[in-house]
């Protein structure tokens, strides 16, 4: 589907010339272009016209949630028939894990997750992996922070169609592998599903509608989209794609391999600390990581599991974590709003995060892979 810009206004003044110059620059593969304009001069409208003409999936990057929300609202109005998504940090409150050597103070990670923002983040990644080209994602600098491997996200995506031969229990297991939870008591809760006889209701993690799958023996008889409030059927579907309920999804094979690699690196790091005369750090690291490994084996996750993302992603040492940018196709457009503020902020946030994690590694709280 192509971008369809909807507006009662037409480009005026310097806007037509700016739009033409930007579009020509993009088609000529100019890597960086800057659009200058005072507040209220219609820069967002100008960019919307460029997006419509270029027709590529677009990331609009802002330096805080408030501005990102404003841009999201504007682009949503400009492109009501296209996929406009919102991707910001889903924490209402976040205190990262840290260690202050000067006062010998260890600070535990503490956070509060906003489930509505998590739903919007999942909607953004799902739209990008759907194969659509008419996707705009408005994001804060949260887009550079680690999330799951898009390859694994795709692997546990479930595709169903009417008439498909599949045992109901096999389908339920695939939902669990996609991190949906069975809950027979909840009226409506994102990321859950319930079963009544041959009917399975799926409360999508990234959408407000319910998907109802009705089985006849070992065949899908019908797929329906249901309004979550009125429970009225909105439409009958011939096929549907169910995306995972969490961005941090992985496979059983990766978990098994990750545990092995964590234990190998733990042995090396403990040996290193002992060789340089740091028995306290060696003991601390061994106890913490061993506990985390046992948790991962038992329940599939642990507190601070993001520190082990390199093992679960199958990445080489020194490579960056997967982030929102990896969910975009190779050829996409990036628009940085107020770049004189946003670009330095990205550098500063990366620097601060690395400094914090370096302390945790040096004092035996985390493995070097956390960096």
Where do the PLM segments sit?
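ASCE RecA-like P-loop NTPase motor cores
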Residues: 1-371
């Amino acid at each position: 589907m192509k971008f369809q810009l909807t507006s009662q206004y037409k480009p005026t003044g310097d806007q037509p010339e700016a739009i033409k110059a930007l579009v020509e620059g993009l088609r000529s593969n100019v890597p960086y272009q800057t659009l200058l304009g005072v507040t209220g001069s219609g820069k967002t409208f100008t960019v919307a016209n460029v997006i419509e003409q270029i027709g590529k999936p677009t990331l609009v990057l802002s330096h805080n949630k408030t501005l990102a929300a404003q841009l999201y609202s504007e682009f949503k109005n400009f492109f009501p028939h296209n996929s406009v998504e919102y991707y910001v940090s889903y924490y209402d409150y976040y205190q990262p894990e840290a260690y202050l050597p000067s006062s010998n103070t260890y600070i535990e990670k503490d956070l509060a997750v906003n489930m509505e923002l998590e739903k919007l983040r999942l909607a953004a990644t799902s739209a990008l992996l759907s194969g659509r080209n008419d996707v705009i994602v408005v994001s804060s600098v949260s887009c550079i922070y680690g999330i799951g491997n898009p390859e694994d996200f795709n692997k546990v995506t479930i595709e169903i169609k009417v008439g498909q031969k599949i045992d109901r229990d096999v389908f339920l297991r695939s939902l669990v592998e996609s991190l949906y939870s069975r809950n027979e008591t909840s009226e409506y809760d994102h990321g859950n599903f319930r079963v009544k006889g041959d009917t399975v209701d799926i409360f999508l993690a990234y959408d407000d509608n319910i998907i109802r799958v009705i089985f006849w023996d070992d065949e899908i008889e019908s797929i329906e989209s249901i309004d979550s409030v009125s429970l009225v059927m909105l439409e009958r579907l011939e096929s549907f794609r169910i995306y995972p309920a969490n961005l941090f999804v992985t496979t059983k094979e990766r978990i098994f391999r990750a545990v092995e690699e964590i234990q190998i690196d733990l042995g090396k790091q403990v040996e290193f600390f002992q060789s340089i005369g740091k028995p306290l750090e060696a003991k601390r690291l061994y106890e913490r990581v061993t506990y985390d490994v046992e948790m991962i084996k038992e329940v599939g996750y642990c507190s601070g599991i993001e520190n082990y993302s390199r093992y679960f992603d199958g990445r080489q040492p020194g490579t960056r974590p997967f982030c929102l940018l990896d969910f975009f196709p190779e050829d996409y457009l990036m628009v940085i709003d107020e770049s004189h503020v946003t670009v330095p902020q990205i550098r500063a946030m990366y620097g601060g995060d690395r400094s914090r994690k370096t302390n945790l590694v040096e004092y035996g709280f985390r493995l070097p892979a956390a960096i």
